[in-house]
Structure formats: C-alpha cells, structure tokens
C-alpha cells in the first residue's frame, strides 16, 4: 500500500460560519462552499485541507457515515489518505483482517472514494 499524502482531515462543527471564520485566523481560505451544502473545505498556503462538516448536533438531523457512533458531537471525524490504488489498499486491509464496512463509494470532487 502506498500512501502518497494525507488528503484532508474532517472536523464536525456546530456552526459552519463560525468555524470558517476561526480557521481563517490561522490562514485558511475557503476553497469550496456551496449553498445548502453542510460542508465547507478550507485550505492553507502549505496545502493543509480541512473539511468542516456542519451536522454536529442532533437537532440538525444530519447523519455522518464517517462517524460510527449514534450520537454526533463536534470534533474529529476522519482522516483521508491519498493512495495510489484504492483496490490495492482495500485488498491489503482485507488480507490483514481489517474489515471494510462500506464502499468503496465515489463522492465529492476530484474522484474521492470512501471505504
């Protein structure tokens, strides 16, 4: 398995606008935010990318498949690795007793795949 880099880190937030403003203090710029989209993508000049996911409270009703607990709280949800081959990575994980519980699922931009 060849991990090329960390692609991004997902963070659940209770207030998307407040979170975007907070990360702007650290030099992050919003590179993706669509109307009615509960995700904002921010990136700094060094290339660190964060996915800010707004559905950190039960009142919003949003499910996040990337958190395998029933109650959703603000905080870390996932780290995404960029690999040279998703199929090879899945095969290596399976061969080492690591179960893939979902996917691969294509989503988002630039051919992202979730497992």
Predicted features and spans:
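Short, flexible, mixed-charge acidic loops at enzyme active sites
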Residues: 54-68
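Helix N-cap motif at beta-to-alpha junctions
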Residues: 15-17, 84-87
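Vicinal oxygen chelate
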Residues: 41, 81, 90-115
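Helix-adjacent hinge/juxtasegments
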Residues: 66-77
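N-terminal beta-strand motif that seeds the catalytic metal site of vicinal oxygen chelate
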Residues: 1-17, 76-79
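Short amphipathic alpha-helices within nucleic acid-binding modules
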Residues: 22, 87-92
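Core segments of cupin and vicinal oxygen chelate
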Residues: 11-51, 55-57, 95, 111
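Loop/turn position at the start of each blade in beta-propeller repeats
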Residues: 4, 37, 74, 110-112
